[in-house]
């Protein structure tokens, strides 16, 4: 009998056979996708207790599934959540539909708005993936190919098949995916700064906030830069990351002495105040272009995502003040 305030996620034992498209992923990630709404802690608990079995045997959470594996999933109940936060975000979910630039049976290409996390978590219960699952309830597989910071807008790839995810991850690994961003930075960017190579080290503050800094102990990182437009006290630059480190463009521009407008971690308060007065209230970093090979047919694809209304308006005001 179900306890009050409990929700049944899986009402009976299920025996599922792993397809070729599902193979290669960890059992814990597979279960998270199958048992939507179940916290990771419960997933690990039912795996550790042996309630989840593969080919009738116990497994560890890091076990990688193979084609033909038979997975036993037990009945699962979780505490009911207050759905109010989701209902508040219904307008955002609906708005995301209009931001889809391309969709086929392999992938979705989205122009992500600023202010939406790619994944719920860290105190957020709403993200791009959750929204797309609400928009595409029939989709069996939806996973991020790469990430964008919450306050960064622009092109985001979402795979609709595991085979597409593997293919695109390989393209990212061998650096054949070309990604370009637009950033509005403080001051006059110096023409000779075309490439920044500075190793980046991730730190976590006592508050739990994640911050990245340039350090010889960090991981190698490289960003290429070119000037798009100059203004009196700012420059619009194109940034093309060669590596994909956390906060890479934001830290590299700060390292060059030209932090990005409205960057709450790495920015400049005086510059931000000037941009606020012009009407900017978001990080001015936008993933505007991507080029890659289609994971199914190998065709070279290129997509562009336009700046939002606020960004366009700020640039126009800066032009008029020159």
Swiss-Prot record:
InterPro entries: PsdUridine_synth_cat_dom_sf (IPR020103), PsdUridine_synth_RluA-like_CS (IPR006224), PsdUridine_synth_RluC/D (IPR006225), PsdUridine_synth_RsuA/RluA (IPR006145), RluA_PseudoU_synthase (IPR050188), S4_RNA-bd (IPR002942), S4_RNA-bd_sf (IPR036986). One of its GO terms (biological process) is enzyme-directed rRNA pseudouridine synthesis. The active site is at 149. It comes from the Bacteria. Keywords: Isomerase, RNA-binding, rRNA processing. Its EC number is 5.4.99.24. Residues 25-82 form the S4 RNA-binding domain. It catalyses: uridine(955/2504/2580) in 23S rRNA = pseudouridine(955/2504/2580) in 23S rRNA. Coiled coil: none annotated. It is an enzyme of class 5 (isomerase). One of its GO terms (molecular function) is 23S rRNA pseudouridine(955/2504/2580) synthase activity. Belongs to the pseudouridine synthase RluA family. PANTHER family: MITOCHONDRIAL RNA PSEUDOURIDINE SYNTHASE, RIBOSOMAL LARGE SUBUNIT PSEUDOURIDINE SYNTHASE C. Responsible for synthesis of pseudouridine from uracil at positions 955, 2504 and 2580 in 23S ribosomal RNA. NCBIfam families: PRK11025.1, rluA_subfam. This is Ribosomal large subunit pseudouridine synthase C.
